[in-house]
């Protein structure tokens, strides 16, 4: 599909993939995010003007790369402001979502937002990824968290042969993937275009890396 360019297009994209209740919660999340961003740097200030495209649609598009019947757990590493994890949890209230974040102020904010919006499907792991207990995640996501080699090193223990990986990347996606394939990843991932940025890509994969 064409790249989303306006906030109206971004909101319409989200509305087509969310219930009315979820869309209302996204609006509230946006208000809370803008307010908190005056106290701590959760997202780039300029991106608040394009929050529906840059953050909400950018997160919701990840759902198109996993089966609709998937109910989790969805593990979001280095969630930061809750992107994409909180957006996924809002859009899919039937999906169990686990947010991993190490920074104290952000942990507190995620806890407050989760309670304020009334999300019952979110668990917050307020610690480093290395300290999170091993689990079998159905989906693993990470936005601007770490280069692919380090990401896989940290997160492979959360994966199974059936795990889906959805990893938003910028222009480096192809290069990162080629590096890992040379190291023995053997076609586990492929590259998808982002609907929110002509230069951005998403690494999509399934399984458990076997070379680590």
Regions found by a protein language model. Give the residues of each.
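Short strand-turn motif at the edge of the Rossmann-like AdoMet-binding core
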Residues: 102, 145, 168-172
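Short, solvent-exposed loop/turn elements at beta->coil junctions and helix N-caps
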Residues: 49, 129-130, 190-194
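Conserved beta-strand segments of alpha/beta enzyme cores
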Residues: 96, 121-123, 164, 187-190
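Active-site capping/gating segments
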Residues: 171-212
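Class I SAM-dependent transferase core
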Residues: 1-75, 105-122
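Short glycine-rich, flexible loops that bind phosphorylated cofactors or substrates
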Residues: 148-149
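A short glycine-rich, Lys/Arg-flanked "PGG" loop and its adjoining helix->strand segment in the class I
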Residues: 152-165
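Conserved SAM/SAH cofactor-binding pocket of Class I
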Residues: 57-142, 152-153
